[in-house]
Amino acid sequence: MSNLYTERVLSVHHWNDTLFSFKTTRNPGLRFKTGQFVMIGLEVDGRPLMRAYSIASPNYEEHLEFFSIKVPDGPLTSRLQHLKEGDELMVSRKPTGTLVHDDLLPGKHLYLLSTGTGMAPFLSVIQDPETYERYEKVILVHGVRWVSELAYADFITKVLPEHEYFGDQVKEKLIYYPLVTREPFRNQGRQTDLMRSGKLFEDIGLPPMNPQDDRAMICGSPSMLEETSAVLDSFGLKISPRMGEPGDYLIERAFVEK
């Protein structure tokens, strides 16, 4: 158990009946890069039950934040959803992950393409001042089924632009593009379809993606990663083949292989 920190739950927020977020204490020894994940878990029958979770908070915050789906029969999520303030949670000491700035070649626009709780690492990315130093525009696309699943929308549109240190950069550079597939909404449809048709780019006022200007990170279900990668490939972008070898776009490989 020495490779685990024991943290304490500070707060829990239920977005709807399928999604929730929680904040925990953070051991000062835990250092991570924006976009990375850790293993988190609970002790079940005397043994740690751990799963990979992206860190949704920026690396300078004193707490950790996680964004999770509720799976009624999921071994861990069925328990995590009942967390309350003061409960203990185990967090691995070694963060890792492929969604890191250094593995992207320099570019003008950064697309953060996510569905569901796949937005978690990008919440960390859009709170990192380095993101705005590297790019002229940062486009956060969040695809969900129902409007109630657009977690963090108020934080992204109202709180973050007022950040005392880099709020002006957010106002100038961050484009938030929420998408809903199963009920009426201003942006409707699947992001891959809207990218292929060009509508997504028209809506945000940027040209279609090209390998000279555009970089991307993708996080979502295995099928979403596969389909979105195919669209980026068709635009001429090349994936980073492995950690430490930069490319035009990145996917979180850890979640693909599960």
From Swiss-Prot:
Give the EC number(s) under which this enzyme is classified: 1.18.1.2
Q: What is one GO biological process annotated to this record? A: cellular response to oxidative stress
> How is the cofactor bound here?
FAD and NADP(+) substrate form hydrogen bonds.
Q: Which SUPFAM superfamilies match?
A: Ferredoxin reductase-like, C-terminal NADP-linked domain, Riboflavin synthase domain-like
Which cofactor names does the annotation list? FAD
* Highest taxon, organism lineage: Bacteria
Q: Which residues form the FAD-binding FR-type domain?
A: 2-102
Family designation: Belongs to the ferredoxin--NADP reductase type 1 family.
General function of this protein: Transports electrons between ferredoxin and NADPH. Provides electrons to heme oxygenase (pigA) allowing anaerobic heme degradation. Provides electrons necessary to reduce and mobilize Fe(3+) in a heterooligomeric bacterioferritin (BFR) complex to Fe(2+). Reduction of Fe(3+) in a pure FtnA BFR does not require Bfd. Reduction of Fe(3+) in a pure BfrB BFR does require Bfd.
From the Swiss-Prot or TrEMBL record, give the protein name: Ferredoxin--NADP reductase
Q: Which gene encodes it?
A: fpr
